[in-house]
Amino acid sequence: MGFNPQGQGNGPNYDAPREMQDLPAGQAYHFRESDETAAARVSPVSNPYEPDYDQLSPPPPLGAQRPVPEQNESSRDLLHSSYQGSVGHNSFDGHSFGHNSYGPGAFGHYPADQHGRMPGSPGYEYPEPEYDVEASRLAESRLSVMHRAPTMQDWGQNGEALSVPDFAHGRPDSTYQEFDVDESWMMRQQQNQLAGGLGRSKTRKVKLVQGSVLSIDYPVPSAIKNAVEPRYRSGPGSMEEEFTKMRYTAATCDPNDFTLRNGFNLRPKMYNRHTELLIAITYYNEDKVLLARTLHGTMQNIRDIVNLKRSKFWNKGGPAWQKIVVCLVFDGIDKVDKNVFDVLATVGIYQDGVLKKDVNGKETVAHIFEYTSQVSVTPDQQLVRPDPDKPHRNLPPVQFIFCLKQKNSKKINSHRWLFNAFGRILNPEVAILIDAGTKPGPRALLSLWEGFYNDRDLGGACGEIHVMLGKGGKMLLNPLVAVQNFEYKISNVLDKPLESAFGYVSVLPGAFSAYRFRAIMGRPLEQYFHGDHTLSKSLGKKGIDGMNIFKKNMFLAEDRILCFELVAKASQKWHLSYIKASKGETDVPEGAAEFIGQRRRWLNGSFAMSLYSLMHFGRMYGSGHNLIRLFFLHIQFVYNLVNVLFSWFSLAAFYLTTTIIMKLVGTPQVLSEYHGWPFGDTATPIVNVLIKYIYIAFLVLQFVLALGNRPKGAQYTYVLSFMVFGLIQLYLLVLTGYLVYRAFTGTPIEEQISFESGKAFFDSFFGGDTGVAGLIIIALFTIYGLNYIASFLYLDPWHMFHSFPQYLVLMSTYINILMVYAFNNWHDVSWGTKGSDTAEALPSAMIVKDEKGKEAVVEEIEQEQEDIDSKFEKVVWRALAPMSEMAEEKPEKKDVEDSYKSFRTGLVILWLLCNIVLIVVVTTDDFITLGVSKAADVRTPTYFRVLLYSTAVLSIVRFFGFLWFIGRTGIMCCIARR
């Protein structure tokens, strides 16, 4: 690849090329004229890995080919450019590019200079452009799958659509065909060590900080640093090195020891910047599309903040972008989808070949990269770079910290790196937590921050998470997605507003939440980090190894622990809130096996944490909350207690509801002249008995499956179970509708509801002797009516039409399948870490003495800028390539202790025993011999009255909490500071 001939190398006087290459191809990249020509250009220095990249063609991705997106005046395919005249050190012949194919004149048309020399000729003097990236658009370009070298007719001019159907033959190739993604990535980590780049690299000696901390600055590719707009590069508070050099630090310590005293530091602190907002993106094994969705959405949100015009805060004390830091924390090298590294390298916050597995024999715990970038990649594998013609639409510079943990040590450990390591150095006011795959909506992060800015007692907050439904809502055709969509929506409409009104939101989803940093410091984080297995030895009995199975299940819902500890913090009055204006989008499980596996963790963790918060409610008295807040917290305590009891007996409740309604509708009643419905007096009872036994058989099957099978190993059986329980529930809904119709038509309505007096009217609904119409009206209004009313008041009612019906059909599966599986796998808590086989392939950093024999230094290969740019070319091709299908992840073998299984067995027995006792008490007459005077036909209606009245009360409480939240939100919008 070409570079500025006036400033070769990467020294302090390096003069980078003024024009950014049109990524990912075009003049910016070289294409071999033929195999013979390409072979002639191979470096004489032997490299066992490099030839593979130059000789093999990448395989076409699995699945359908992605089309090249349509272009308009604001979106230009980066594969296109104006190709007039020579385009680099080697001229373009209409069919191929030379090895060095871009220079200052490669990305736009330059006229002849004053001496008559043409662009690309020796001695040509390039004019100084107005912007470093000439004529660049806010380009969101996607690399399509191509299989031949382009001709001049293929390329077109600026902004034209590319007509080449195939394009890979003739471009620099990779090892993808011979090696899988992981092997290719491991090879790239050794290239610098084995071959010294392209054979022209030198070595440099890097001094260690305090003799032990390895921190090195690496030049970034020319394309990335030239993408930065001049107004930012030379703006107030900007530092040249943050745009031209990527900083790498090999942290060989525990997060608690990552301190200034021990020689560790971060660029925002080094530049003496105040960090107002620390945005953390936690990653496990998501693909590059999911990561790009989160990363690009975050950068768009930062643009929303930077572009604020009337803000009293962000426009003072320096540029807004310098007050924001984005931190990516990856949980272990082994689990990472290696394609993700190419996306990060394209942005500029990662480079191959710089990772060090140890420093002088001391194992690296985390690899930390720092860079400030103005480049982004969209989920559609399109590249976004600045457009000088539309600066308000450009993404601002973003300060990135990329923490790649060497071993997989779970999410809590990732948060320990975030809060204890980076947080203590940066000392942010607000920390926002986002899971990879969650896309923050427009101004979502700004809305979260404004909640803290306008409420000094707000300790934590969350926004609305909604389900990704696909184009035109096509994913709603999957009933599991529709059910989860309704669940998310109704939680945002009723549950979160109610808890926000009380001041204690039981769970701020880790996928999209925010905390005031000084609020969670101290005991909240201390208790939270007890779940970090890397601290198990130092914590002893307080650590994860010393916990019983109940507490270990609590840490399956680790975000709930942080919420409770924050509200109950001694002598403090922090409260939690839900912020309606902040919205995030996430994907949900689409298959039965994935859905069951996810809910096992959620149900067990939330149930254990609910019991913990109820048992430790007394800690609220030691907090600094006033009497009014404590009063409402007591109401919430009762509300949560009732919900826990309902959950515990829900297995029996669904069975009783199913069997009793079938009995009421299907059994002929001669005195009342009611016939069996819907199949007649003879067939209906038989059908109902068959359905009853099918219900019991499939319920027993769930226990068998849960005790002996993984969901993925029995996914077809689980799909059948969902279908069976769904059909039974649908049949039950039809019978319920008929029962309601019969209640209103069998006895005149005026005889059931009296308007003679207030007492008579009250008795019509709660007296129990004047008919069931009043009770049915209460049930219909509170269970269905309030949901519709609240959704319309929330201005988001559509889920009640396209998702509510599916939820009604499948709601019994939440108990009969999900809860049964969760309780039967209560023992399934795995906390162990796996060693990193991938990390073993990384090079080491060996400490030597300097020439004077005094200071400790590390010898590091120093690559030429041309080599960096050449490798970057291949990185972008990989990053923007359509994503191939991923192989199914292999399950980990788990060693479960017998004590955990014993506890699980006891829990399941107790749960079943309680539910069986409830069923027997309600439905059998055998208790008459024990002195119980009322028969089953009397106890059954009483049970249903209590159940319906309790449900109605809970629904009314939720609705009033919703009304209070809506009113308060409307008022705050009028008086909030910006």
UniProtKB/Swiss-Prot annotation:
Pfam families: Chitin_synth_1, Chitin_synth_1N
Gene inactivation effect: Leads to lethality.
Glycan attachment points: N72, N604
EC category name: transferase
Biased composition (Low complexity): 1-13
Location of the region described as Disordered in the Swiss-Prot/TrEMBL record: 1-95, 108-127
Annotated InterPro entries: Chitin_synth (IPR004835), Chitin_synth_fun (IPR004834), Chitin_synth_N (IPR013616), Nucleotide-diphossugar_trans (IPR029044)
Keyword Glycosyltransferase among UniProt keywords: yes
Top-level taxon in the UniProt lineage: Eukaryota
Subcellular location, principal: membrane
GO molecular function terms attached to this record: chitin synthase activity
Membrane-spanning segments: 641-661, 686-706, 719-739, 775-795, 803-823, 908-928, 946-966
Membrane topology: Multi-pass membrane protein
EC annotation from Swiss-Prot or TrEMBL: 2.4.1.16
GO cellular component, one term: plasma membrane
Catalytic activities: [(1->4)-N-acetyl-beta-D-glucosaminyl](n) + UDP-N-acetyl-alpha-D-glucosamine = [(1->4)-N-acetyl-beta-D-glucosaminyl](n+1) + UDP + H(+)
Any one GO biological process: chitin biosynthetic process
Keyword list, A-Z: Cell membrane, Cell wall biogenesis/degradation, Glycoprotein, Glycosyltransferase, Membrane, Transferase, Transmembrane, Transmembrane helix
Subcellular location: Cell membrane
Function summary: Polymerizes chitin, a structural polymer of the cell wall and septum, by transferring the sugar moiety of UDP-GlcNAc to the non-reducing end of the growing chitin polymer. Is essential for viability.
Family that this chain belongs to: Belongs to the chitin synthase family. Class III subfamily.
Record protein name field: Chitin synthase 3
